[in-house]
């Protein structure tokens, strides 16, 4: 069967000479990221023209307005961007014609007006920009018509794209290394047998095939039945397809460029160079995180977290409270009992997850009928000074389960444990304004307490407490409210326990957030994980070399030098440690990272390396990546061979 081209330039999917040959030299591409955001399209200025016969001046300019609206200048950048959008729509013209939708290709020139005048935001601005002769302009009405036209067609394109994607991913039209081929008739029968019956590629095979030929380099229609041999069509996106394709020399040029661009933007927008500044910075410099954090309050030492308080009474304290018209007992003790100091807590949703917690019913029968709850305890004195029930002013039940513990338990290997159970509380600080001593605790509401509870602390604070910030009104450091943060004071000044137990508003986490962003940048663009030397390691070596040389010459030998090979190894370990766990730089005693000046040297060195980087970034990994891609191509060849065997072409 001949591959006849109609007047609409539609290729026959069964045409003679059709081939399918994926090659790593060109990747499939179209236009998934045409940039239509403000800043690309705006601002360009409006059309102004002179009024009167005198010499042109800013005072003589008037804004051009008619029944089509005002006129916006179509700059070269805007024209290129809109033309790409129009071309992307027109690529689907065979399907628009087959389905009798649309009215021919979209032509940008049909929406523009050629005029002469001045272009700017104001009359003064336009006059200073100079005269524009025979320039292209878009009237307000035409802008809206163009937008509606493209949007309406994209609605249809979105549906067709989904069906084409299904068919083409079935065929796997790209390889990452080398070349492969498959007999077109075999591959076509394979796809026709497998594609869902409602896939539109079955209804309009030639039209979809024609569109695919413009998007996928692997598809090459054969020669039409004409006396004059015509060249085989190439995809419309062959420039981007070529530059997106991985190369054996430097990997992906597009990938390297994107990684460097993202890294430079992150460094500039997040002020990462200030991560070890030794002067106070306003907290607004840092980007606080509203991400939830999870803790185990029963195991947090109050010395590590200002929001944890501890009761250390010698004897149990029992307080009666009323909940849903029933009296219950809340008990503190025996032994140290840790609670939340609500005056040190941030505005947050608190969720105490006690799922799986062991219920010692045999040791304490009181718990079987008790109700798990989260309560607020208001005291007359600080909690550590509470010695008797009269020191407690009142108890408020914030959240309680709907049933007793015995009905909420499940037996696991002989131990009764809580089934899935979450206790929730929404906390806003203004609700406790003026109350100096108020504490939150997960515990049991015991209806009929006995001596069984005298030897069993009913606390539930060993559950997982998730704190989801609602609003960060203030920043704290070491328990005190601060307006500024000095990063160098925070660095290498915390224990790992303090870092783990810090709330979202703590200066430790603000600086930690900066460190994580810096570590992400370093990991993305610097080959720290490889065995090669890199900019991050080099920056650290420079600082280590000074200190090590000073120590070596302390004995009087003015020419003594340290073992630089060992310094490179130490620096490599430190750089790798930072990239994998940047919070280590906050902790006391961490080798190298805790040393003064190391992090600022790393930040400066990495920033310079990124700003002066090139598209050849991927060269260090190109060889290993090429080997991996070649292995994938071998698997693809095996796949196509099986297709040809199972669907032999006639």
UniProtKB/Swiss-Prot annotation:
A lipid is attached at residue 2 (N-myristoyl glycine). Its main location: virion. Interacts with VP6 and VP7. Keywords: Capsid protein, Glycoprotein, Lipoprotein, Myristate, Outer capsid protein, T=13 icosahedral capsid protein, Viral penetration into host cytoplasm, Viral penetration via permeabilization of host membrane, Virion, Virus entry into host cell. Interacts with VP7 to form the outer icosahedral capsid with an incomplete T=13 symmetry, about 80 nm in diameter, and consisting of 200 VP4-VP7 trimers. Myristoylated N-terminal peptide may be released in the endosome and involved in permeabilization and delivery of transcriptionally active viral particles into the host cell cytoplasm (Potential). GO terms for molecular function: host cell surface binding. Signal peptide: none annotated. The gene is S6. Glycans are attached at residues 110, 407, 493. It comes from Aquareovirus G (isolate American grass carp/USA/PB01-155/-). GO terms for cellular component: T=13 icosahedral viral capsid; viral outer capsid. This is Outer capsid protein VP4. GO terms for biological process: symbiont entry into host cell via permeabilization of host membrane. The record marks 42-43 as: Cleavage. InterPro entries: Mu1/VP4, Mu1/VP4_sf, Mu1_membr_pen_domII, Mu1_membr_pen_domIII, Mu1_membr_pen_domIV. It holds the Pfam family Reovirus_M2. It comes from the Viruses.
């Amino acid at each position: 069967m001949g591959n006849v081209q109609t007047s609409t330039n539609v290729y026959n999917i069964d045409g003679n000479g059709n081939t399918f040959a994926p090659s790593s030299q060109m990747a499939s591409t179209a236009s998934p990221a045409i940039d239509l955001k403000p800043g690309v399209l705006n601002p360009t200025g409006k059309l102004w023209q002179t009024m009167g016969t005198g010499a042109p001046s800013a005072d003589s300019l008037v804004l051009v307005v008619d029944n089509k609206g005002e006129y916006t200048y179509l700059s070269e950048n805007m024209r290129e961007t809109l033309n790409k959008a129009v071309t992307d729509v027109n690529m689907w013209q065979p399907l628009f014609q087959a389905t009798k939708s649309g009215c021919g290709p979209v032509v940008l020139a049909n929406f523009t007006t050629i005029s002469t005048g001045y272009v700017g935001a104001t009359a003064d601005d336009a006059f200073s920009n100079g005269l524009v002769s025979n320039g292209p302009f878009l009237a307000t009405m035409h802008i809206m018509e163009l937008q509606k036209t493209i949007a309406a067609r994209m609605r249809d394109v979105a549906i067709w794209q989904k069906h084409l994607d299904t068919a083409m991913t079935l065929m796997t039209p790209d390889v990452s290394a080398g070349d492969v081929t498959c007999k077109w008739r075999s591959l076509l029968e394979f796809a026709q047998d497998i594609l869902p019956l409602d896939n539109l590629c079955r209804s309009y095979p030639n039209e979809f095939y024609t569109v695919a030929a413009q998007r996928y380099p692997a598809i090459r229609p054969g020669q039409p039945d004409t006396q004059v041999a015509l060249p085989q069509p190439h995809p419309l996106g062959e420039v981007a397809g070529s530059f997106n394709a991985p190369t054996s020399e430097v990997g992906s040029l597009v990938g390297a460029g994107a990684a460097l661009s993202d890294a430079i933007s992150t460094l500039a927008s997040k002020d990462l160079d200030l991560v070890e500044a030794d002067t106070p910075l306003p907290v607004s410099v840092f980007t606080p995180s509203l991400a939830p954090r999870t803790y185990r309050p029963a195991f947090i030492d109050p010395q590590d977290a200002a929001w944890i308080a501890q009761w250390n009474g010698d004897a149990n304290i029992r307080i009666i409270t009323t909940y849903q018209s029933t009296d219950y007992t809340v008990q503190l003790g025996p032994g140290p009992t840790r609670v939340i100091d609500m005056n040190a807590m941030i505005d947050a949703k608190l969720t105490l997850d006690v799922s799986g917690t062991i219920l010692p019913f045999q040791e304490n029968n009181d718990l079987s009928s008790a109700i798990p709850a989260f309560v607020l305890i208001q005291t007359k004195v600080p909690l550590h000074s509470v010695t008797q029930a009269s020191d407690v002013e009142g108890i408020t039940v914030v959240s309680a389960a709907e049933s007793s513990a015995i009905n909420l338990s499940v037996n696991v290997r002989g131990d009764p444990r809580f089934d899935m159970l979450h206790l929730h509380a929404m906390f806003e600080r203004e609700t406790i304004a003026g109350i100096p001593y108020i504490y939150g605790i997960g515990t049991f509401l015991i209806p009929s307490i006995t001596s069984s509870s005298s030897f069993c602390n009913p606390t539930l604070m060993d559950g997982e407490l998730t704190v989801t910030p609602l609003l960060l009104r203030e920043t704290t450091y070491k328990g005190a409210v601060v307006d500024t943060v000095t990063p160098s004071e925070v660095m290498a000044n915390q224990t790992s326990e303090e870092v783990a137990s810090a709330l979202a508003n703590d200066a430790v986490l603000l600086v930690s957030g900066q460190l994580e962003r810096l570590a992400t940048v370093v990991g993305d663009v610097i080959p720290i994980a490889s065995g090669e030397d890199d900019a991050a390691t080099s920056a650290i070596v420079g600082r280590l070399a000074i200190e090590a040389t000073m120590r070596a010459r302390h004995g009087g030998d003015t020419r003594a030098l340290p073992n630089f090979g060992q310094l490179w190894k130490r620096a490599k370990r430190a750089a790798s440690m930072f990239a994998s766990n940047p919070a280590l730089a906050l902790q006391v005693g961490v080798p190298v990272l805790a040393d003064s000046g190391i992090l600022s040297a790393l930040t400066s060195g990495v920033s310079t390396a990124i700003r002066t980087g090139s598209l050849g970034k991927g060269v260090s990994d190109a060889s290993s990546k090429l080997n991996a891609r070649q292995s994938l191509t071998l698997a693809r060849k095996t796949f196509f061979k099986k297709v040809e065997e199972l669907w032999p072409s006639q």
